[in-house]
UniProtKB/Swiss-Prot annotation:
<dbReference type="InterPro" id="IPR004368">
    <property type="entry name" value="TIF_IF1"/>
</dbReference>
<keyword id="KW-0963">Cytoplasm</keyword>
<dbReference type="GO" id="GO:0005829">
    <property type="term" value="C:cytosol"/>
</dbReference>
<dbReference type="InterPro" id="IPR012340">
    <property type="entry name" value="NA-bd_OB-fold"/>
</dbReference>
<dbReference type="InterPro" id="IPR006196">
    <property type="entry name" value="RNA-binding_domain_S1_IF1"/>
</dbReference>
<feature type="domain" description="S1-like">
    <location>
        <begin position="1"/>
        <end position="72"/>
    </location>
</feature>
<keyword id="KW-0694">RNA-binding</keyword>
<keyword id="KW-0396">Initiation factor</keyword>
<protein>
    <recommendedName>
        <fullName>Translation initiation factor IF-1</fullName>
    </recommendedName>
</protein>
<dbReference type="GO" id="GO:0019843">
    <property type="term" value="F:rRNA binding"/>
</dbReference>
<dbReference type="GO" id="GO:0003743">
    <property type="term" value="F:translation initiation factor activity"/>
</dbReference>
<comment type="function">
    <text>One of the essential components for the initiation of protein synthesis. Stabilizes the binding of IF-2 and IF-3 on the 30S subunit to which N-formylmethionyl-tRNA(fMet) subsequently binds. Helps modulate mRNA selection, yielding the 30S pre-initiation complex (PIC). Upon addition of the 50S ribosomal subunit IF-1, IF-2 and IF-3 are released leaving the mature 70S translation initiation complex.</text>
</comment>
<keyword id="KW-0648">Protein biosynthesis</keyword>
<dbReference type="InterPro" id="IPR003029">
    <property type="entry name" value="S1_domain"/>
</dbReference>
<comment type="subunit">
    <text>Component of the 30S ribosomal translation pre-initiation complex which assembles on the 30S ribosome in the order IF-2 and IF-3, IF-1 and N-formylmethionyl-tRNA(fMet); mRNA recruitment can occur at any time during PIC assembly.</text>
</comment>
<keyword id="KW-0699">rRNA-binding</keyword>
<dbReference type="GO" id="GO:0043022">
    <property type="term" value="F:ribosome binding"/>
</dbReference>
Amino acid sequence: MAKEEPIEVEGRVIEPLPNAMFRVELENGHRVLAHISGKMRMHFIKILPGDKVTVELSPYDLTRGRIIYRTK
């Protein structure tokens, strides 16, 4: 069984939560819970409220995601 491709969407960080989790509002108005990807943790990339980010969502659970890029 082939793994389905993740969905990439743009959003803005609303609030930081414990354990490197963030509440992100997507461009379409939906709010998701997102965590930082491993590479971003390794390179100590800081994410603050108001930052524009790219979020990767699983097609199986559209309420949770992974932050994969922070736009300047």
